[in-house]
A protein has these predicted regions:
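Aromatic- and charge-enriched surface segment that lines or borders ligand/interaction sites
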Residues: 87-139, 171, 263
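Ligand-site clamp/hinge motif
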Residues: 205-211, 236-282, 293
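Surface-exposed binding/hinge segments that line
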Residues: 101, 124, 133-198
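A structural "hinge/loop" feature
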Residues: 29, 44-62, 85, 112-116, ...
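N-terminal lobe/hinge region of extracytoplasmic solute-binding protein
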Residues: 39-94, 130, 137, 215-217
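Ligand-binding "clamshell"
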Residues: 25-26, 281-293
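Append "and occasionally in soluble cytosolic enzymes with long acidic Gly/Pro-rich linkers
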Residues: 232-235, 312-390
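Short, well-ordered beta-strand elements
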Residues: 35-44, 87, 97-101, 125-128, ...
Length: 390
């Protein structure tokens, strides 16, 4: 079963900038959670403020784009790579070497815990990626050695070196060409950190705070975090693209499910992210609200453990695929907000194969194939996610 999910956001009055966060020191709480701000209601937990250390969740989906920037970005309409912190780049050695030329006008955020003394430079990029890829780097094991996204790709094994050529030029050398390399650097998992901030924490012997008290170059910076309640983001006045229009964004974590819907309907939220599909009728019928949908880059699918018999047999996996009624799932689970996918890649991906075929629903054929393989009364254990985006 593979489903391409749509991104769902309900907007009351105005559009939001997305926002995300993790653990940072508590500040004095304002009497009013709004405090002249914009309230974005979303469900999720914050375990880290560093998207490199997360596999998914609030920091990746919402906060990373507010706190940090990457070398590259992906245009949301054309799905093509576009410059971000790197204003240009070169592909050399048939795709085994990548050279990035950095912008010279990018400032890090000035927070209660850090005041930068310089602009972004090559040292920050080298520090960021050496920490991820070099297992001997002094920062690699801080807050655990796991970098889930890059670990899952065994990415470090293909990175030979990350080095500074000059103050504004960084070069990545790979062990072999990789056509997907640039696309990985455009994910939020490749957010760029401050080497100067890391050096300050090292002098204080407080290295663990790098992932808990974030400092980035993004449009908003962390101002206040109340675990399980809200995250307050303050405008980064020195943002290189220009000062954000909103002085602050509040990410409301306090309610889930119908609680978030109630907050939207009573005006406590300006935006409700990822509403449950079962709530769409209510949202569509309310003239005060605007529901926006667009194809997502995410998918839901049934992943087989191919190390375990009989799932190591492709014929068994095909027989199981024949037994799944995708169209029924589209309506009963996703209420028409998803489409059956023919590939593990979403349609919006640059690598999507338009010739990929969708497995038909044919339970009789499924039973016959399993019987021919000598399999009856097959019992499988399923692990399923519990998040609202599952």
């Amino acid at each position: 079963m593979r489903l391409v999910l749509s991104s769902l956001i309900v907007i009351a009055g105005l559009l939001s900038s997305q926002a995300t966060a993790a653990t940072a020191p508590e500040q004095t709480a304002s009497a009013d959670i709004r405090d002249s701000g914009f309230v974005y209601c979303v469900s999720g937990q914050v375990n880290t403020f560093n998207p490199q250390k997360a596999s998914s969740g609030l920091i990746v989906d919402t906060l990373a784009a507010q706190l940090y920037d990457r070398l590259l970005d992906v245009d949301p309409y054309t799905y093509r790579l576009v410059p971000e912190l790197a204003e240009s780049w070169e592909v050399l050695d048939n795709g085994a070497t990548y050279r990035f030329h950095l912008r010279r006008d990018v400032s890090f955020q000035k927070t209660a815990w850090f005041t930068p003394t310089r602009k972004l430079n090559a040292d920050d990029v080298v520090f960021t990626f050496q920490r991820i890829f070099d297992r001997r780097h002094p920062w690699h094991n801080i807050n655990g050695s796991s970098f889930p996204y890059f670990d899952s790709l065994q990415f470090a094994d293909n990175v030979k070196s990350v080095r500074k050529l000059d103050n504004n030029t960084v070069e990545f050398r790979l062990t072999q060409p990789d056509a997907s390399f640039l696309w990985h650097l455009a994910t939020h998992y490749a957010s760029v950190m401050s080497a100067e901030y890391a050096a300050q924490l090292s002098r204080k012997d407080r290295q663990e705070l790098l992932d808990r008290q974030p400092v980035g170059t993004g449009p908003f910076q962390l101002s206040e975090y109340r675990a399980g309640q809200f995250i307050r983001l303050q405008r980064h006045d020195g943002f290189w693209r220009g000062k954000p229009l909103m002085p602050q964004v509040v990410v409301d974590l306090g309610s889930g499910g119908t609680g978030r819907l109630s907050k939207l309907l009573t005006g406590e939220c300006d935006v409700l992210a990822w509403p449950a599909a079962s709530q769409l009728t209510i949202l569509r019928d309310d003239p005060r609200l605007r529901l926006t949908l667009r194809p997502g880059m995410n998918i839901a699918y049934l992943a087989f453990n191919t190390d375990k018999p009989p799932l190591n047999n492709p014929a068994v996996r095909h027989a199981l695929a024949l037994s799944i009624n995708n169209q029924r799932l589209m309506q009963s689970i996703y209420y028409g907000t998803a489409e059956t996918a023919a590939s593990i890649l979403p349609r919006a991906s640059w690598a999507y194969d338009n010739d990929a075929k969708i497995t038909e629903y044919n339970p009789q054929k499924s039973r016959e194939q399993l019987k021919a393989l000598g399999i009856e009364n097959l019992t499988l254990h399923l692990w399923v996610p519990t998040s609202s985006q599952a």
